[in-house]
Amino acid sequence: LLHVGLQQILLMDRVPASAAVSTAVELAKRERLQRLAPVVNGVLRAAVRAVEAGESLPVPSDPQKRLALEHSLPDWLVAELWGQIGPERTEALAAASNRIPPLDLRCNRLRSSREALLENLPAVALEELPDGLTLTSRAGPLPQLAGFSEGQWCVQDRAAQRIAPLLDPQPGQRVLDACAAPGGKTTHIAELMGDQGEVVAVDVAPRRLQQVSANAERLGLRCIRTEAADATDLTEWEAESFDRVLLDVPCSGLGTLARHADARWNLKPDGIEELVGLQHQLLEQGARLLKPDGRLVYATCTVHPAENTGVVEAFVEENPDWQFSEPPLQLWPDPQGGDGFFAAVLSRRR
């Protein structure tokens, strides 16, 4: 309650200080904290007096600790990023992590066109993406917007829309999406293939695959087949049996903190190291399943080098018959919209 009250008093201009104090006190009484209500009242009124007197909160002199405090990030995470990507990138990421992300859509080119959607939706085109648009206003629940029930579009961040095209999937091919749920990239792959061929969507959680199937059904995509399996152990699957492999691996999610406000507090210093081990396993398994002339995309929604270039460069070094097909893609969280993503395209040397 004190945190909420101080947030309103210090940072929210539209909430009168008196209302912030009285609301917090009333909530304390309702939540069986009646004996502490005078404490809440006293602390918040003292804060109001300090603000009116022109006083400000003490700010740490250390730039890393100040950044962590100002943007509500764990101290260890700021220190880690500061050392890995530098102060400027860390400051930009911290600022972007507290913005309200825009709501981006991807046009289902098999059922509509971006031009047609723009005529019926409060949206503008994302010029850098052939099928992307972003809503300019939210009027009611998404399922009530034009074209939703007809499967003409789905929700997908503009950065995520950059991943599936890197596979360059072709009609008639067999494609593996090894960490598929909830299915945004799975359905994008199927659309790019003209719904011709087979997209095998794998996830370790059967319930999450139900969401993949539901999305595919709404979008009218028939080439998607779901299979519950642990993608770190696909040794029983036939080697070199897929034309394309997408590995959108589990990661720290540092590129999507704006969408998951609590994620920053769930991360642990040793968690990234554990994730890197998992990512290595997934890459080894996915590579084994790719045909000799195929194309593999390793992707994350993080900006941590250990999970990105660290994983793929180690793989290429350990497997000399593999190479980068093109320079890796690093997208940084953008305050104007767009999550942080990384993608590397790998193939066997000919």
What are these regions (language model features)?
Residues 1-350:
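S-adenosylmethionine
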